[in-house]
Amino acid sequence: MNRVYFKASRVLAGVLMCLALVACDKAQSPPAAQAGLAFHPGDECHVCGMVISDFPGPKGAAVGAGGTKKFCSPAEMLGWWLQPENHRADVKLYVHDMGRSHWDAPDDAHLIDARTAYFVIGSRLKGAMGVVLASFSDLEAAQKLAREAGGKVLRLEDIDQKLLGQAGAMSSMSH
């Protein structure tokens, strides 16, 4: 009889340990919407100081130990994050999924992890000053925009300061 209780208690302890580990994993990184991340009319871009809601297109946010920093575009956010002093793994990067939002009014319910996003650079779409990076969770949606409005599909690891600088120079000539 004691053996049965001993085995049952070991099994129960194992199950409880698994549940605790699963709960810890889920609490570690909530989606942007669950974290309460939203853009408000008075929010200013962390880089340029402009009012974020004054511009169409996707926005960006970096969430880390130092709080939340909001940006008027994914390009502004990535330009900031690519600086050596800001390029940290513990910073969560969010952008609007433009496959699920209207260009003129991105929906904060559709913020996605920038590390998994597809970006279209070089399109004819207008956004905040400088480089326009349209962000998508779905490759097909990104490819569709690139076909219809021009541009090239990239992943986060394809984007660096040099690319942002070159695209910014080209963008200022065409505006």
For each of these PLM feature ranges, what is it?
Residues 1-22:
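Sec-dependent bacterial lipoprotein signal peptides
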Residues 150-175:
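N-terminal targeting pre-sequences for secretion and organelle import
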Residues 29-37:
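Short, intrinsically disordered, charge-biased short linear motifs at domain edges
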Residues 91-156:
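Thiol/selenol-based redox catalytic cores and closely related redox-interacting motifs
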Residues 24-27:
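Bacterial signal peptide processing site
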Residues 37-70, 75:
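Post-signal-peptide N-terminal segment of Sec-exported extracytoplasmic proteins
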Residues 81, 103-105, 163-167:
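Short, charged, surface-exposed secondary-structure boundary motifs
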Residues 75-86:
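Short metal-binding segments enriched for Cys and/or His
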